[in-house]
């Protein structure tokens, strides 16, 4: 049996370092959450003694914030798909002039710093509130609109990339055999673009769930998303219960990715996203 070449060894070493770089921060967070030191002096890894007491001391506010973030992210992903799919169809199939301009316009929110977006929506909601008496800041609707603004371009981008490779003769063949436009869309177009929809929805969910800058401007005490709650916990009274809370989210996120892989396959999601 021939020994592996230096190139093969170097490849495995490089891949190993890449995995270590990605997994080490999560391993430190999860491992430190089990440290049982009586006097907390900082992040301890590896833990000196094992305990689960910090999981029992996770503040109830973290679970409330987690529920808010999950509900918000799911609704944002759904709304981004409802807005993004028609927009992508209009850009690719429409006969309007200046398609490249509209595509660049739809992608603009991805290029704007999130802090600028948060400030802009805060000022917009205050101005609209002064005019109408309805203030959307520190409300679910306001936070939803802010996240929808930055999440929808991901759905547009992934669906556009699929539509640009779509063979329109399939639709023409279906319509030539008597299928209506709606039936053609439901049976031919929609199943074909679903990998792009899945990719965009996943990106939209992650953008909303992990956002801090926009939520910092659009939340208030008692109405805080999970990342902001973690941020405040680390800033004011950092202790291992914060690490325990973050560890639960890490574990559940990995389980969710496994479910996505089982249901639709991450390969289709990644390929659709990379083709933008």
Give the label of every model feature segment.
Residues 2-8, 37-41, 51-61, 209-259, ...:
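Interhelical loop and adjacent transmembrane-helix boundary motif
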Residues 2-13, 35, 160-175, 181-190, ...:
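C-terminal transmembrane helix and the adjacent membrane-cytosol boundary/short C-terminal tail
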Residues 25-38, 65, 118-132, 202-208, ...:
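A structural signal for multi-pass alpha-helical bundles of membrane permease subunits
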Residues 42-47, 52, 98, 115-149, ...:
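Membrane-interfacial helix termini and adjacent extracytoplasmic/periplasmic loops
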Residues 13-26, 108, 118, 149, ...:
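Transmembrane alpha-helices
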Residues 1-67, 71, 75, 259-276:
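N-terminal, non-cleaved signal-anchor transmembrane helix
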Residues 64-71, 126-155, 195-196, 201, ...:
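Loop-to-helix entry region at the N-terminal start of transmembrane alpha-helices
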Residues 1-7, 74-106, 119, 123-127, ...:
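Transmembrane-helix boundary motif in ABC transporter permease subunits
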């Amino acid at each position: 049996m021939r020994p592996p070449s230096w190139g093969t060894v170097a490849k495995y070493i490089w891949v190993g370092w890449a995995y270590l770089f990605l997994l080490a921060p999560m391993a430190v967070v999860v491992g430190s959450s089990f440290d049982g030191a009586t006097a907390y002096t900082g992040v301890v890894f590896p833990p000196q003694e094992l305990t689960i007491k910090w999981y029992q001391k996770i503040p109830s506010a973290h679970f409330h914030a987690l529920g808010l973030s999950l509900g918000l992210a799911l609704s944002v992903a759904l709304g981004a798909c409802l807005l993004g799919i028609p927009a992508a169809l209009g850009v690719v199939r429409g006969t309007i002039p200046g398609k490249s301009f509209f595509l660049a316009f739809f992608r603009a929110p991805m290029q704007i710093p999130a802090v600028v977006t948060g400030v802009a929506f805060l000022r917009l909601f205050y101005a609209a509130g002064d005019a109408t008496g309805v203030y959307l800041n520190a409300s679910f609707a306001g936070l939803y609109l802010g996240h929808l603004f930055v999440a929808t371009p991901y759905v547009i981008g992934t669906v556009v990339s699929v539509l640009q490779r779509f063979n329109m003769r399939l639709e023409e063949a279906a319509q030539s055999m008597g299928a209506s436009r709606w039936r053609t869309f439901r049976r031919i177009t929609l199943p074909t673009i679903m990998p792009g929809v899945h990719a965009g929805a996943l990106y939209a969910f992650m953008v909303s769930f992990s956002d801090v800058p926009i939520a910092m401007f659009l939340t208030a005490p008692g109405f805080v998303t999970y990342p902001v709650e973690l941020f405040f916990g680390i800033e004011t009274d950092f202790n291992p219960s914060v690490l325990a809370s973050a560890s639960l989210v890490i574990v559940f996120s990995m389980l969710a990715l496994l479910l996505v892989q089982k249901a639709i396959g991450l390969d289709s999601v990644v390929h659709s996203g990379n083709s933008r």
